[in-house]
């Protein structure tokens, strides 16, 4: 099965614009808590994280169909990370036994390794995208180290790295919107008229 992309599908804002803004908003919300601005994650963030994960999944699919592999991997990875974080928060709110922090550290370490590999794979793209993915990996690593060592200053460092990463994601999103929002084409037009396998 193939998917034929035509110009009518590419007249709106690009998937990168929506996906990176979704990442920016979600990472900003969680990083405010990690940076010590708030003492815990509040219900409004818990209510926001699942819809953002779904939007990232949709943007990942659309990016894949437009042969934008880095964006697809970042959006799928972010969506799955947020989905699993929401599932962990729901499980922790239930009557189950609390997991040891060292175990939670492994959760964040695995995601840090994942985004570290994505960062290495992003060397062919723009510097803001590279720095965003690197910042996300370092923020997750700092959270893992906090859970392993019990040193709260590492969480604060990770929180501020996360806030900077959120600003970088917002910059990537805004630059795509500014560069292509008013034109008759978008970054998705680079594959205009080409046939791509859909499976």
Which residue stretches match the model-derived regions?
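N-terminal topogenic module of multi-pass integral membrane proteins
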Residues: 1-59, 63-69, 192-198
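Alpha-helical membrane segments in multi-pass integral membrane proteins
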Residues: 106-120, 127-148, 154-175
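Helix-adjacent hinge/juxtasegments
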Residues: 81-106
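Hydrophobic residues within membrane-embedded alpha-helical segments of Major Facilitator Superfamily
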Residues: 22-25, 29, 55-58, 77-81, ...
């Amino acid at each position: 099965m193939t998917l034929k992309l035509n110009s009518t599908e590419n007249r709106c804002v690009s998937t990168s614009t929506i996906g990176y803004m979704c990442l920016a908003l979600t990472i900003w919300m969680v990083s405010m808590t990690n940076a010590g601005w708030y003492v815990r994650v509040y219900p409004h963030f818990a209510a926001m994280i699942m819809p953002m994960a779904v939007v990232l999944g949709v943007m990942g699919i659309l990016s894949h169909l437009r042969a934008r592999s880095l964006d697809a991997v970042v959006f799928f990875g972010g969506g799955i990370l947020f989905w699993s974080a929401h599932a962990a928060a729901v499980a922790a709110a239930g009557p189950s036994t609390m997991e040891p922090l060292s175990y939670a550290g492994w959760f964040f370490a695995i995601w840090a390794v994942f985004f570290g590999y994505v960062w290495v794979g992003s060397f062919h793209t723009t510097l803001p995208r590279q720095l965003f993915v690197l910042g996300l990996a370092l923020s997750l690593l700092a959270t893992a180290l906090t859970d392993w060592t019990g040193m709260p200053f590492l969480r604060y460092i990770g929180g501020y790295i996360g806030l900077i990463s959120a600003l970088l994601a917002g910059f990537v999103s805004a630059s795509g919107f500014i560069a292509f929002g008013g034109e008759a084409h978008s970054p998705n037009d680079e594959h205009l008229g080409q046939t791509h396998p859909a499976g």
